[in-house]
Amino acid sequence: MVRKGDKKLAKPPTTKAANSQPRRRATQRRRSGRADAPLAKASTITGFGRATNDVHISGMSRIAQAVVPAGTGTDGKIVVDSTIVPELLPRLGHAARIFQRYAVETLEFEIQPMCPANTGGGYVAGFLPDPTDNDHTFDALQATRGAVVAKWWESRTVRPQYTRTLLWTSTGKEQRLTSPGRLVLLCVGSNTDVVNVSVMCRWSVRLSVPSLETPEDTTAPITTQAPLHNDSINNGYTGFRSILLGATQLDLAPANAVFVTDKPLPIDYNLGVGDVDRAVYWHLRKKAGDTQVPAGYFDWGLWDDFNKTFTVGAPYYSDQQPRQILLPAGTLFTRVDSEN
């Protein structure tokens, strides 16, 4: 040690080097038994599966049944006229209520007559890919793919050509968007014995786009095949015979079923001596038939949708007007009462 006199020399001051790495602090862990604070969290709806998970369904259903009394069959008489929609097939109709779109994968029709083997006359059956096509003559049906011609006592299978594009399950006025086509069966010649014919449909479809619709929204409209003329209505009556419209589905409709038409029905009625006025009706109610007219009748009138009541309209008054069409062929009948 260097001494200068009796005093010590002081050491130079030293500085501590700064730590390049900060000191690591221990984090406090939350107790595992303590629950999180309640928070509002969004939940996802489950049960739909994958977005592309379509449903395939198949089955066999009777779509029509008709009786042709002996000797009543004539060339071109319509026996069956059915527009193919989901509601026409019971199993498919229930399943289609939870989907918006469907595509037909297979479609076949079995014509099954029940009559003696010596019954004269026959039938032609064909499938019209356009459900709005009004040309259902023998030549038009025979020109379609899969059409058949047979004697009344012979069974045949119609294997038609149909669209495979997606259609809508809920029916509307534009039937090309909701139906793959129509099956039509016509008489050929006169049947010498009574014929009971059933039409079975073998089908398979693909359902897509899940949804939910009520049965009232999926009622299929019925297309008339013959015009209604004013001279077909009796003077003083409030209705007409169902067979005048040429639609088997309307003939088979139950009593008290109420339909709305897409075209107005003008009815002339008497206001007094020499005074005639015209009313326009949009609703018709089916009335039970009798021994002379088993298919029943249709009454025109006013429909109260709120109270679900039908009021019969004014009686028809002829006044010897010239023949005119009141409802043209191709008029759509859509059921509106609560029993559909």
From Swiss-Prot:
A Pfam family found in this protein is: Capsid-VNN
Where are the annotated coiled coils located? none
Region Disordered: start-end pairs = 1-39
Gene3D superfamilies reported for this sequence: 2.60.120.20
Keywords for this protein: Capsid protein, T=3 icosahedral capsid protein, Virion
Question: What does this chain do?
Answer: Capsid protein alpha self-assembles to form an icosahedral procapsid with a T=3 symmetry, about 30 nm in diameter, and consisting of 60 capsid proteins trimers. The capsid encapsulates the two genomic RNAs.
Name of the molecule in the record: Capsid protein alpha
Q: Which organism is it from?
A: Striped jack nervous necrosis virus
